[in-house]
Amino acid sequence: MTSVSGGSPLLRPQLYRTVTVSTILQADQQDRFLESGELSQLATYLTSGNKRLDIIITLTNNSEAIVSRAANRIFVGGSPISYLERPQSGIDAKLGTNSYVESQSGFLEGFRSLFNTGGADITPAGFKPINVSRYGITRMQKSLRDLDWFLRYITYAIVAGDPNILVTNIRGLREIIENACSSAVTLVALQEMRRASLSYFTKDASAEAIVKQYFDVVITEFLAPAPSDLVRKRTSTSLQGLKLPQIYANAVVQKPRFQMKSTLSTTEKETVIKAVYRQIFERDVRRAYSLKNYDLESKVKNGQLSIKEFVRALGKSKLYAQQFYEPFINSRALELAFRHFLGRGPGSREEVQEYFALISKGGLPLLVDALVDSKEYEEYFGEEIVPYLRTLGEEAQECRNWGAQIKLLNYSARFQKTPQFITLFAGYKNPLPDQHPYGQGNDPLEIQFGAIFPKETLQTKAAFFGKDTRRILIRRGNGIDNQLSNPSARQKSPGSFGPKVFKLSSVASLNKNTKNVSFGETSTQAIIKAVYLQIIGRETYESQRLKVWEIKLENGEISIREFVKQVAKSNLFRSLYWTPYYVCKSIEYINRRILGRPTYGRSEINKLFDIAAKKGFYALIDTLMDSPEYDESFGENTVPYERYLTPGGLALRIKRPNLSVSKEAKNELRFIELGAINESRGERSIQLRIQQGVSKRREQTKIFKLNHHDDKVNLEKVIKAVYRQVFERDMDMYRIQNEFTVFESRLKNKEISVKEFVEALGQSQLYQKEFYTPYPNTKVIELAMKHFLGRAPKNQIEIRKYNQLLASNGIAALIRSLVSSLEYAEVFGEDTVPYRRFPTFPATNFPNTEKLYNSLTKQTKTISNPSFAPEKTRRIDLLSPGA
């Protein structure tokens, strides 16, 4: 049970705290609204936002000068700032134009800083400047990088409004730096950076105070000793003893600790009692359901009953039994009781068995007594502390119940009826040896190596393997020659049952200490092709071939083994099997290509992973090529071939007799299947189907277009058509108005086009009175699109677009936008009167246009293209009939 894992869900623990997150989480954990002091704190932080950004911009723009002053203070004998490696900017600097900033304040300021310690800054004992030439390039680069990181962390903390990010990342660095150089030197550099940064804010007292505050935190935390780890207490040998680094606990927002004391006020005692209800019932049942135990609460407030006994009484209450005992089976009720009374889930199979026997024997009261009277409860909560959830960040979490515990501590745990821990621990007793140690899928595909795929889903089941599990591999060839049962058979050829083997026989050379291969051009070209196919996985392009090494192989200067090694170290192989993948998957690929088999298990992957991490890609290739297994299996002049494969890979290569191509289900969309034509149709039949649903009115539509202004009759027809289109009726009696007379005369005098005449009518007072004032905005948009584009709105996106325009700029802007649109220009142009169109695409818009045109304008105010089906309003009686 020591090597098992309860699933590995993807978690992102909190790395630092901010003002907003800390304040809101504290209120959320206590199930309350923000108090006036917290709101004031947030308001102060948000009000200072612009000033904080200005501070950060100033520090960022002068970061090199600040780091330069600090470096000049602690380094001598060179230009230390030249070793600062800055992130590559968007525009690469030209060659030969690199410049370095020594100090923005000039030589005098730098000379003054040597003798002026700033009044309050005291040079620590043991400080001695470091010689640049003796310190070395690598150390100089790391030192300048660290100084730059200190300044960068300060800018992060200023934005967050909380120095927690500095506490989390800086405390404990002194011991690490002490091993590399000197903590006194680092302290002097930080003091100089503080002095240099404050010099940019001498005219702004508030900004200077903010910068000084965060620099003081950096110096204080740097001098503080490294925090000790949080050790998880355990009361049984079956539980895992774990420890959590202090920095993780400092980064998260801690659960509030509620402790009852006799000196608390009445309001504070009420808050503690509310916390007990929230922990035991997972919500404040007093506020939600007005359920209170006045007798117990009064005894707690008067000091007659401790919090521990109050928790025990609530756990034995009828309400708790109804909520968390009666609806569940015993194993699930046990898991929920662990959450409520100990703040965690069961940690081992032995613990589940122990408490399961208690709940089976004495029911819920005996289980509650056992948990509350346990030594663990006494050590964590005592008599007066309210139990709390011991989540990630509060203490170290066990790996054996990782996924199940995270799900148990979730807010929705009480809605899960199925027990999780008992099935999880039972699964550990049934290991499946035929499984890859880094996954649960048992390699269903050859390309899925079961490595660590990051998934957002929560896996609470056990991974059915241990660290010593070995995968089953099937030999391609005689099974009796498997290298595990018969290691001496590695050199045997697989024969007709395995893959084809390419091999060159060695011949004598002038140098007796070396071996050369055959000089035949045909055979060597076949060997070269086989090497590319095995190592690269395909034939290579001409530009990707290793011509120099191919010539050496043909001339007998190198062996096939050396040629394989060079191909495996090529940029092509690296780009295919190393760069795109994480290390575990790359190791699996490379192992298959070079040794001809998948990896056996976790121990082999761990060994290769360690080599790749410490020595790099080329050392990994050398390790595999120089291994005894490669030497025994292929030797010097044999091309590597596939020797073993997984059961899943073998199953994929075998054609099953009861499966045929003709019986495979067709993966076609339903509308394609229903739309298939099984008959021959004539032209008339096709035309009828094209025009189905469209009345004869489309064919009878007359389009009015102004071709010549001199044709008075045609001009009069166009003007009347515009009035009928825009106002939906003849306007002879309204045309005598001065407003319309001006528009008509300008059209007749060729001063405006038909398009501009239409826009002028749409922006008139009469149009606003008839089609804007009486209707809601959505109906106004539909009518405007009917009058000026000849159709209804296509969808809700179009309605939202014009609704925003109408609400912000008015009806005139809406009309101008429609008439000036690309659609209007393409359909009507400058001199065509808008007319009713019959748009059949999208099909869902056609009935909306029909409904819009077939209903009289003054008949209804309903919307033709609603976003949802309208519901009838219901009448709600606020008072009961008897009231």
UniProtKB/Swiss-Prot annotation:
Enzyme Commission designation: 4.-.-.-
PROSITE patterns, per database record: PBS_LINKER (PS51445)
CDD domains assigned to the protein according to its UniProt record, in alphabetical order: PBP_PBS-LCM
Subcellular localization(s) per the UniProt record: Plastid, Cyanelle thylakoid membrane
Broad class of where this protein is predominantly found: plastid
Residue span(s) of domain PBS-linker: 238-418, 488-669, 684-861
EC top class named in words: lyase
InterPro entries on file: Globin-like_sf, PBS_linker_dom, PBS_linker_sf, Phycobilisome_asu/bsu, Phycobilisome_asu/bsu_sf
Gene Ontology molecular functions: lyase activity
GO cellular component: cyanelle thylakoid membrane; phycobilisome
Disulfide-bond pairs as recorded: none
Positions with a binding annotation for (2R,3E)-phycocyanobilin: 181
Topology in the lipid bilayer: Peripheral membrane protein
Coiled-coil region: none
Family as reported in the entry's similarity comment: Belongs to the phycobilisome linker protein family.
Function, as annotated: This protein is postulated to act both as terminal energy acceptor and as a linker polypeptide that stabilizes the phycobilisome architecture. May have intrinsic bilin lyase activity.
Protein name (record): Phycobiliprotein ApcE
Organism: Cyanophora paradoxa
Source species taxonomy: Eukaryota, Glaucocystophyceae, Cyanophoraceae, Cyanophora
